[in-house]
Amino acid sequence: MGQFTVVSLGLLAMFLSLSGAKGDNCPASWISRNGVCNKLFPDRKTWLEAEKRTWKWSDRTSTNYFSWNQGEPNNVQDNENCVHLWAPSGYLKWNDEPCASLHPFICQYKL
C-alpha cells in the first residue's frame, strides 16, 4: 500500500462525489478514482486523531490551493488552528475551527 493521506472533511457529500468505478486494486469498501483509493470513515475523530502520523501530503508538496469562506480564517479566541469544509457553503469553502472538533474523515492512497 502507498502512503496514506488523511483529509478531514465534515461531510458525506464529498465522498459521494468520488463515486468512480470500483478498482480491482482497492480493498473492499474503498472507491477507486483517478489512480487513488478513497474511503469514508463515518466515526468521528479530531483533526489530530484523524491525521496522526500522516500530517504531510503523501508526495510531500505544499498546497497552493485555498478556498476560505469569506471572513475566514478568523481564528476566534485564538483557538481555531484546523480547517473543515463548511456546510453552509455547500461544502465548497473552508472554515477554521478548534482542532478538538469532531468530523468524519476520508483516507486516500495512491495505487
From Swiss-Prot:
One of the record's GO cellular component terms: extracellular region
Position of sequence motif Mannose-binding: 72-74
Family: Belongs to the true venom lectin family.
Binding sites annotated in the UniProt record for Ca(2+): 80, 95-96
Residue pairs linked by disulfide bridges in the UniProt entry: 26-37, 82-99
Range of residues in the leader sequence: 1-23
GO molecular function, one term: carbohydrate binding
Tissue specificity annotation: Expressed by the venom gland.
Sequence ranges assigned to domain C-type lectin in this UniProt record: 33-108
Purpose: Mannose-binding lectin which recognizes specific carbohydrate structures and agglutinates a variety of animal cells by binding to cell-surface glycoproteins and glycolipids. May be a calcium-dependent lectin.
InterPro entries per record: C-type_lectin-like, C-type_lectin-like/link_sf, C-type_lectin/snaclec_domain, C-type_lectin_CS, CTDL_fold
Main location: secreted
Name of the protein in its database record: C-type lectin lectoxin-Enh2
Matching PANTHER family: MANNOSE, PHOSPHOLIPASE, LECTIN RECEPTOR RELATED (PTHR22803)
Record Gene3D superfamilies: Mannose-Binding Protein A, subunit A (3.10.100.10)
Location in or out of the cell: Secreted
Keywords: Calcium, Disulfide bond, Hemagglutinin, Lectin, Metal-binding, Secreted, Signal, Toxin
